Every structure is written in structure tokens, then in C-alpha cells.
Amino acid sequence: CALPIYLQGRKGLQSYFVKRVHKILLKHGKTMIAWDETASYLPEDAVCQVWREHDYAEVAASKGNRVIVSLFTPHYLNYSPFFHTMKSIYNFRQVPADFSAKQRELIIGGEVCIWGRQPTVEDMEGLTFPRLLAFSESVWTAPEKRDWRFFKRRLKPVQNKMESEGTEFGGGWRDLFTPK
């Protein structure tokens, strides 16, 4: 006699839970978004939010799931801008070059995250800007059309405007002063 899936260890229980929550959300006309730990058993109409590595985006997209890319590196802004630099965010490919056309269509967007357990509320704005600007341009601009030097030149006027409106820019400018 086979055990019910929810009694087949942690993965079985998690799979059972995800499917139950999915049914509840569908009943209320909502779309499920789940972390990439569920990629291998996520219902096809759910969205997979990938935070660990692109391999999970490939697993989810291969199954037909839509995907949001928010990889820990470089998208977690609560980590030091000296490790997750503005340039690494700017140059990041949301969609790997080796994805098929069908897989590329299933990448519906990207997201940067800032988790409050490390920085203080006061630090969050400085950690977010200017890196959020680099992320925005990287998501909206095809990799072959990006120009890091042109982007850097455009930042200073934006910084001046935002600071005049009370937005704090952080110290993550190290990569602005390095060649290319």
C-alpha cells in the first residue's frame, strides 16, 4: 500500500501543501507565485519566482510555468553594494542566452529584493539607490543594446534630482569609478 503523498517526507508534504493552496487561490481567481523550491511540482498555471540560480528558471519554464527572476546574486539589495555592485546588476542577463524561444517567452519579469532583517529602515533607501536604476535599465534594455558608460553619464543628473526631492543615494558607487 503506497503512502499518501503528504506522508512521503518533506518534499511530499510541501508538494501536497502547494497543490492545496493552489486550489484555494484558483477558487478566488488568484494566481499562485511560489519560490523556486517548488519548481519541479508547481502547477502549470502558477508562476515560479526564482531566487537561487537560473537552473530553476529552466526547470520551471520547461514545464510551462511563467517565471520571475530575482536571483540572490545580484538582486538582493540588502547585501553590500561592494558585493552586489551596480555594474553586476546592470550587466546581469535576466534570460540566459541558451534558453529556447519558448522558455524566453515564459520569463515574465525580474525583481530586486531588499529584506529587512539586515539593514535598518533608514539604510534601505541608500542600499536601493542607485542600484535600482541599474536593475530597471537591465530589465528594460536588451543586453546587446546596453551601454554601461552612457548609463554612468546619465546617473549624476538623476541623482541630483532625486536627492533634491529627499531620496538618499547610497555609497554603492565603487564601480562607477573603475574603467569600462
Regions found by a protein language model. Name each.
Residues 5-180:
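Substrate-binding groove of N-acetylhexosamine-processing glycoside hydrolases
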Residues 1-3:
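Short, small-residue-biased leader/transition segments that mark boundaries at the very start
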